[in-house]
Amino acid sequence: WSGIYCGGSAILAHERLSIVDPQSGGQPLYSPDKKVVLAVNGEIYNHREIRKEYAGKYDFQTGSDCEVILALYQEYGIHFLEKLNGIFAFALYDSEKDEFLIARDPIGVIPLYIGYDSDGKVYCASELKALEGFCERYEPFLPGHCYYSKDGKMTRWYVRDWTQYEAVADAPASVSALREGLEK
C-alpha cells in the first residue's frame, strides 16, 4: 500500500505498514470532500473513543485508526493535537487553504525529519535519506512539536509543567525510591 498525492503546493508520498484496517486504510488518507490530505505514520490509541464521538458528525472513509486526525482537524483546525493519545508523525495538507501542518508525537517514538531547500521549500520524511539531495539543510523534527506553514516555524505543542526545571526544582530526588518504584 503505497500512495502519492500531488496537488496545489504539496506532494505527499507514503509507504504503509498496515496493522489496523489493512484492506481499506491505504494512504494518503482523504477527508470526505477530498480537500484535506493526510500522510501519517503512527498509531492513535484513543481512535475508538474519537470515532464514537464523531459518529454522525464525520463521514469516516476507512477503518484506519489515523483517520480520526482528519475528523479532529475538521472541527478544531490545527488546534487538535492535545486530543490525540498515541505515537505519530504526520503531514496534513489542506488544499482549500493551501496550508499544511506537520506534527510529531510528544516523546518522539515515530521518527521524523524536516528539511529546507535553497528556495525555502519545506520537506519532511521519516527517513533522513529521503531528504538528501533535495535539502540544503535538514534536522530532526523535535518531539512534541509542529510546523504550521502559515506561521513558517516550529512550535512546541506538547507543554507540561514537569518539562520545565522550575516546576520540579524542589522535588525530592531519591535514587533508592526510584529503584524501588521501578522494581515493583
Task: Kindly give the residue locations of the regions a language model identified.
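Cysteine-centered catalytic environments shared across enzyme families
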Residues: W1-K184
